[in-house]
């Protein structure tokens, strides 16, 4: 029997049953109705949605209809900066950038250095803040412009957030956050208060613009508890409910459900060099057979293979991805060749990303929200 999985904003353990998790959280499945509505307004559908990486939501259809009525809205997501960024972290950001390109709305990006400081007993606050600046380079490298991307580093840009967070905190009882997040008597009060800050950004565009400006939040599904609470209290505070679009976790190279920062070989980082990327892909778990002869005779299993999973992420051509799938199943494609194909795709992506990342190094403060409000 499979180990019972655990998913919280701070821990993912076991093999995740995504349908069961969606039902536990009370989110809705992303259906063809919502996808068609997106296509109506965006003109196309991103591969991350077509291929099922994003699979659940809250009010995604409602915010698209809001857009159709010509009303203002914004995008919001974030990152807990505890180390370098890996490709799994970037999946919601890639969709975020695509949505920005299609709709041209403002983007709010929260770097939760305070949360990571509270959560990790070994983390120094200065270290978390340093990682916030480093991780911001990966966001900027995707091509956002300073007038539209508003970076919020919690310990540096708290001023516009705190009045909203105070109102949020007054609405949330200890019993509510304890039940939602699993807090215990040993949880420090920083972590207990922190949800107020993550929720506050969902209401920030409305405060800044002085009119209802709901947000759409593309993020991994482990973040749902925050935004479930945000939706529960929004109307009582005079704010529109945030909408969410939830992704699955990106399979680890080792075959587990989610990449792990504690195991560097489970993920490809945006700062990895080509030699490291090649080694990680060469050593990746696959759905292949023990020998080439068996693979040719029996075929492989791409459904459990992180290498195929990454092809789905990095190849925009549906026909190409389908060919890899069927070639693996039939035994025509061996794992070594498949890994080499993947290496070329990822090498190209990371090389371009690293170049853009370095160009952003002296520009972070120009994107910070507080520098625009001062």
Tell where the protein language model's regions lie, with residue ranges:
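Non-catalytic terminal extensions that flank enzyme cores
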Residues: 1-79, 231-282, 288-294, 306-374
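Short helix-capping/linker segments at secondary-structure and domain boundaries
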Residues: 104, 204-215, 315-324
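Divalent-metal (Mg2+/Mn2+/Ca2+)-assisted nucleotide/phosphate chemistry catalytic cores
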Residues: 119, 125-243
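Divalent metal-coordination and catalytic microenvironments
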Residues: 86, 139, 222, 256, ...
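Short connector loops at secondary-structure junctions
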Residues: 108-123, 250-252
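N-terminal catalytic cores of NTP/NDP-binding nucleotidyl/phosphoryl-transfer enzymes
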Residues: 43-116, 217-221
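Small-residue-rich helix-loop
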Residues: 300-304
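Short, solvent-exposed loop/turn segments at secondary-structure boundaries
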Residues: 86-89, 121-125
